Amino acid sequence: MTKLNELAPAPGSTKGRMRVGRGPGSGKGKTAGRGVKGQKARSGVAIAGFEGGQMPLHMRMPKRGFNNPFRLEFAEVNLWRLEQAVEAGKLKAGADVSVADLVAAGVIRRELDGVKLLGKGEIKSALKLTVYSATEAAIKAVEAAGGSVTVTKKAKVQAEA
């Protein structure tokens, strides 16, 4: 059986890299295959999106949408991730679990504007969770496992206002 470290291109199927601009004897000296003068002969080649004076495509298309400065971004946590943390001993079954506990356990990197509990996967451990938002499926699954979910509904940014 062929090993990955033994793979090689077929003999004669590849060429070596051509070093350009190294004298007339090389066949690729002086202008190094770039022709004579002009923008394309210079380093950096073309200006991205420039179409020779024609209105570029990105400017012909209409503007669309906007960036909402008040948009809230939630750290999402799935049920399987919580169960994984319990099995690894990072969270205790039956304990109260806050957002700070999730960060400390490495379940989420940081809080962002809040934590949203999602229902992907299964949870067998009873946890008393306090989150900013949760899906119906996630709440039902946690309660079926003997735990509870407290939804505060006020994200960090909204609470400050």
UniProtKB/Swiss-Prot annotation:
InterPro entries: Ribosomal_uL15 (IPR030878), Ribosomal_uL15/eL18 (IPR021131), Ribosomal_uL15/eL18_sf (IPR036227), Ribosomal_uL15_bac-type (IPR005749), Ribosomal_uL15_CS (IPR001196)
A Pfam family it matches: Ribosomal_L27A
Calcium keyword on record: no
Keyword Ribosomal protein tagged: yes
A Gene Ontology term for the protein's cellular component: cytosolic large ribosomal subunit
GO BP annotation list: translation
Source organism superkingdom: Bacteria
Gly residues bias (residue ranges): 22-36
Keywords of this entry: Ribonucleoprotein, Ribosomal protein, RNA-binding, rRNA-binding
Annotated GO MF terms: rRNA binding; structural constituent of ribosome
Region (Disordered): 1-41
Database matches in PROSITE patterns: RIBOSOMAL_L15
Function: Binds to the 23S rRNA.
Family in the record: Belongs to the universal ribosomal protein uL15 family.
Subunit text: Part of the 50S ribosomal subunit.
Protein's UniProt name: Large ribosomal subunit protein uL15
Organism for this UniProt entry: Caulobacter sp. (strain K31)
Gene assigned in the entry: rplO
